[in-house]
Amino acid sequence: FKLPKFKMRDIDDIEELKINYTLETIAELKAKLKAEEEGPHGYKETNYQTIKEIFNESVEKFADRPFIYEKFNRKEGFKGITYGQFGEDVMNLGEGLSKAFKLKGEKIMIIGETTYPWYVSYMAMLCGVGVAVPTDKELPDNELENLVKRSDAAAIIYSPKKKDQIKKIANKCPGVKYFIEMKSDHKIDGRFVGMDFV
């Protein structure tokens, strides 16, 4: 703990001060220091260096709390996904892309609506799988093709709504190793694969 600071002009001031550091005084100083460390609003100050650190702490701290509510199917209502499930999905995708598909450190384009699989894909990139290349879902075919080539993306993760557009440009983008469709469990078929298979 830190002792309070006193301004001293000369050596006589030390004698004059005479602070008695009893156990009570020390406990009060510790409590004051703890309150200062927690900040003015009662929040503990943090010293994060990366997004991954924030992600890991949130997943651990709020594991059972809802992260997002999403309608995965028009016939059913909203389904809640917890931080714990989100963390597990991010780690599973990250491990699959890194180890099974050998995409660690590669540029991976993500194109589609901002849905739960989009969040999982993007967070997997931020947690160290590779470099995320989030792309506007409204791009016409020729612009998407040019962006894929200029970005030097090794893989594209896309939503089912972009499937036709991706199929049109796939043959014109030989540098892309994998085209990964969100919300699909299709096994590897050439360069195409479902995200749930990863």
Predicted feature locations:
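AMP-dependent adenylate-forming
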Residues: E28-E37, I54-I81, A100, I110, ...
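Structural core segment of the AMP-binding/adenylate-forming
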Residues: F1-Y21, C127-V198
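A conditional alpha-helix N-cap/helix-loop micro-motif detector
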Residues: N47-Y48, V90, T114, K137, ...
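A short N-terminal helical cap/helix-turn-helix that marks the beginning
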Residues: D13-T22, E45-Y69, E88-M91
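Conserved AMP-binding/adenylate-forming
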Residues: E76-Y83, G94-N142
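Short acidic-aromatic active-site loops that bind/stabilize oxyanions
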Residues: K44, G80-G87
